[in-house]
Curated annotation (Swiss-Prot):
Coiled coil: none annotated. One of its GO terms (biological process) is positive regulation of amyloid-beta formation. GO terms for molecular function: cytokine activity; type II interferon receptor binding. Keywords: Antiviral defense, Cytokine, Glycoprotein, Growth regulation, Pyrrolidone carboxylic acid, Secreted, Signal. The modification Pyrrolidone carboxylic acid is found at Q24. This is Interferon gamma. Released primarily from activated T lymphocytes. It is found in: Secreted. InterPro entries: 4_helix_cytokine-like_core, Interferon_gamma. One of its GO terms (cellular component) is extracellular space. Its main location: secreted. The gene is IFNG. The lineage of its organism: Eukaryota, Metazoa, Chordata, Craniata, Vertebrata. Belongs to the type II (or gamma) interferon family. Homodimer. Interacts with IFNGR1 (via extracellular domain); this interaction promotes IFNGR1 dimerization.
Length: 166
């Protein structure tokens, strides 16, 4: 790379970093708006300990943490849904919701659609309850470690086969 290329690369980095900082600053501003609206900075908010932080600290393994995070994200989406008609905080909630889903689902549109679909399933609907019970055995089988072990062995065999062929 010549001198001009270095300068152009540096300028690109500066532009990208500053736009990221700007987005981050906007994100924090929206959280501050919500804190102010909900009066969440008062000392009495900490009474009884944290809701999520202590739980998140306990889980280190990525798969375990993802399960906990999915429940937390689901909680926030339900919270935001309860205040969807509040024009004072609507923009803040929308901004945070988009950022949260983007980070949690790695900006995957299909994961986002499926996640939102799952959290909106009405638990009190009799037809939904019947379908859920009907699918329970398949869900339990999918959760079982044995099926994951089989998948892992299959992928290891594929990897070994590729390595041996080289």
């Amino acid at each position: 790379m010549n001198y001009t290329s270095y300068i152009l690369a540096f300028q690109l980095c500066v532009i990208l970093c500053s736009s990221g900082c700007n987005c981050q600053a906007m994100f924090f501003k929206e959280i501050e708006n919500l804190k102010e609206y909900f009066n969440a900075s008062n000392p009495d908010v900490s009474d009884g300990g944290s809701l999520f932080v202590d739980i998140l600290k306990k889980w280190r393994e990525e798969s375990d943490k993802t399960i906990i995070q999915s429940q937390i994200v689901s909680f926030y989406l339900k919270l935001f849904d309860n205040f969807k008609d509040n024009q004072i905080i609507q923009r803040s909630m929308d901004t945070i919701k988009e950022d949260m889903l983007g980070k949690f689902l790695n900006s995957s549109t299909s994961k986002r659609e499926d996640f939102l679909k799952l959290i909106q399933i009405p638990v009190n609907d009799l037809q939904v309850q019947r379908k859920a019970i009907n699918e329970l055995i398949k869900v339990m089988n999918d959760l079982s470690p044995r099926s994951n072990l089989r998948k892992r062995k299959r992928s290891q065999n594929l990897f070994r086969g590729r390595r041996a062929s080289k």
